[in-house]
A protein has these predicted regions:
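Metal-dependent nucleotidyltransferase catalytic core
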Residues: 1-17, 32-39, 44-94
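Conserved nucleotidyltransferase catalytic core and NTase-mimicking acidic/glycine-rich helix/loop elements
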Residues: 6, 118-243
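Secondary-structure boundary/capping signal
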Residues: 21, 75-79, 109, 179, ...
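Short gly/ser-rich loop at a beta-strand->alpha-helix junction or flexible surface loop bordering the NTP-binding
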Residues: 22-30
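Conserved NTP/Mg2+-binding pocket subregion across the NTase superfamily
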Residues: 65-155, 242
Length: 243
């Protein structure tokens, strides 16, 4: 797999966007202390000045596309690219994502773009409840397709852990708590709040970290515990009232 450092990414973004590049922000696990080497990717937010609303010229657009492809080939999602105006007016649409970015970030280029950006608890609760139910349905579908295949069950557990932690951090923010950097502590606290056993998630964290891989006899039970926990979390959020 090709490699590209964050410094090289910023250099290429500056060359592609020139004066339109306002800010580049690293967010997520790599900025929050729970990055897993050789497994976690790097999430990057790119903010552009509109400069009179004119579209990118063809050479700039082509250069930006080449940067995104190279970053993707290095194992990372393409940069999330927005205009400054879009960034400033979208926190009510993506409150979970904004809350995560606001709390776990590192500015790589330009000015910090966070002044005046807020996330309301009502917006957060609405998106969180929808996302939890959506994840529950995805897990059920994945479990059906995996059947009793332990390898596919383990892959589903590993692939879903990052999203689970995004949801869990949002639950803690809904309660006015700052999520711990450690995924074990996060899952344990959310389990206590919502009334589910966090053990399947703690086991999944060890699996993903490479500390103790899931055995064939464990995978089905861990996946089943995942589904049961998210079912309970969905019920909890449906009945949740702010203190």
């Amino acid at each position: 797999m090709a490699t590209m450092t964050l410094d090289e990414l910023v250099r290429q973004l500056r060359a592609a966007y020139k004066e339109r590049l306002a800010s580049v922000v690293l967010y997520g696990s790599a900025a929050g202390g729970d990055h897993i080497p050789d497994r976690s990717d790097y999430n990057v937010l790119v903010l552009l000045d509109a400069i009179g609303g004119a579209p990118l010229d063809a050479p700039s657009a082509e250069a930006a596309s080449a940067v995104a492809r190279a970053w993707r080939e290095a194992g990372n999602p393409p940069p999330m690219t927005m205009s400054l105006e879009e960034w400033r007016r979208s926190s009510d649409i993506f409150p979970m994502e904004y809350a995560d970015i606001l709390e776990r970030n590192r500015v790589l280029h330009g000015d910090p773009p966070f002044t005046g950006i807020t996330v309301t608890l009502s917006d957060l609760r609405l998106q969180l409840e929808q996302q939890v139910m959506g994840k529950l349905l995805q897990l059920r579908q994945g479990a059906l397709l995996a059947g009793t295949d332990a390898k596919r069950q383990s892959e589903l557990v590993a692939a879903s852990l990052s999203t689970m932690m995004v949801l869990f951090r949002a639950v803690l923010r809904l309660h006015g708590e700052r999520p711990p950097a450690d995924n074990v502590a996060t899952a344990t606290r959310v389990g206590a709040l919502a009334g589910f056993d966090p053990a399947p998630f703690l086991r999944a964290v060890r699996h993903v970290r490479g500390e103790a891989k899931l055995s064939g006899t464990e995978a089905g039970a861990v996946l089943g515990g995942y589904v049961a926990a998210i079912e309970q979390l969905s019920r909890y959020l449906d009945q949740y009232t702010a203190p």
